[in-house]
Amino acid sequence: MELLIQPNNRIIPFSAGANLLEVLRENGVAISYSCLSGRCGTCRCRVIDGSVIDSGAENGQSNLTDKQYVLACQSVLTGNCAIEVPEADEIVTHPARIIKGTVVAVESPTHDIRRLRVRLSKPFEFSPGQYATLQFSPEHARPYSMAGLPDDQEMEFHIRKVPGGRVTEYVFEHVREGTSIKLSGPLGTAYLRQKHTGPMLCVGGGTGLAPVLSIVRGALKSGMTNPILLYFGVRSQQDLYDAERLHKLAADHPQLTVHTVIATGPINEGQRAGLITDVIEKDILSLAGWRAYLCGAPAMVEALCTVTKHLGISPEHIYADAFYPGGI
C-alpha cells in the first residue's frame, strides 16, 4: 500500500494498520506534532484521496469539523491514500514534556484575573501562541496559554475566575507565591508563523490577551517586519488590563498598532466602543494576504472567524484558539 504526500509529491509504502504519524516520522517527513495523544491538534493534516480512520473526534477534537482533516497521531492507514501536510514550511516540533515549576508571583490586574509568574526547573521550548496544561494538584489541572517567550526568566499565565469553576476557584483560593505546580506541553496550533511576510491581525478577548502577547512579542523579537494590527477587547472598563503595557510596546515598535475595545459602558480617550467584530469591520476593507490570530471566548472567536473570512482572508490562514470552559 502507498501513501502520497503533498505538497512534495512523495510516495511512501506502508502496511495496513500503520499509524499515520509514525509512518511520516519513520520516513523523515516533516510534520508538526507535540502531545502524541490527540489533545493538542498540532499534527492535523488533510486527506485528499482515500480513507483514513481517525479517532481524534473521540478524544475531544471538536474543532475538527471538516471530515477531510485528521490528526496524524490518532489516524490508522487502511488503504492507498493521499494527504496534504499543511504549511510544510512552518513545521514546529516541540516534544511534549512535564516540568516542575514554582509560582514566584501572583498579581491581580483585574477583579477576576490572576496573573501567575512561574519559574520552571528546566528550559521549556514552545512556539509563541501555544499553551500548556498547568496542574496545581492531582485534581486541579487546566490548559492555559503562555503570555511570554521560551527564553523569559519566568513563564506568565493569565487566569480568569469562572463562577463555579473547580480549577479557577482553586487557583484564586489556594495558589500563592511558593506554590509548586507541574506544567505539561506545549500544545496548540495557533502559533506564530514566522515565514509569513505580510500583515498580521492579532485579536485577544479577555485573557485571550496572553497568547496574543506571546505572538506579538515573538514576531518583534525574531525581527519580523510585518505590520501588526492588535485588537484587545473586554466587556467594560473594570475588565481592562495591561493597556499601558500594550501601548508602550507599540510606541517602541512602529510596525505595531494597538486598539483597545470596550464593549459596554463609558470609554476613555483613545479607546474604541462596541463589539470588536464591528470595530474590525469598520477599520479594515480587506484581509487578503493577511494572517489572523484569534484568541478568547468561543462565541467571540467564532464571530471573528466569520468576519475575517468575509473580509477576504483564506480560511487556512486563520489561527484560532478558543477558550472552552470544559473542566474549569
Swiss-Prot record:
Q: What does the UniProt cofactor note say?
A: Binds 1 [2Fe-2S] cluster. Binds 1 mole of FAD per mole of enzyme. Also able to use FMN, but the activity is less than that obtained with FAD.
* Impact reported for I276V: In strain: G7
Record note on what altering A16P does = In strain: G7
Does NAD show up as a keyword for this record? Answer: yes
List each copy of the 2Fe-2S ferredoxin-type domain by range: 1-89
| Cofactor field | [2Fe-2S] cluster; FAD
The protein, known as: Naphthalene 1,2-dioxygenase system ferredoxin--NAD(P)(+), reductase component
Q: Which species is the source of this protein?
A: Pseudomonas putida (Arthrobacter siderocapsulatus)
- Could you tell me the gene encoding this protein? ndoR
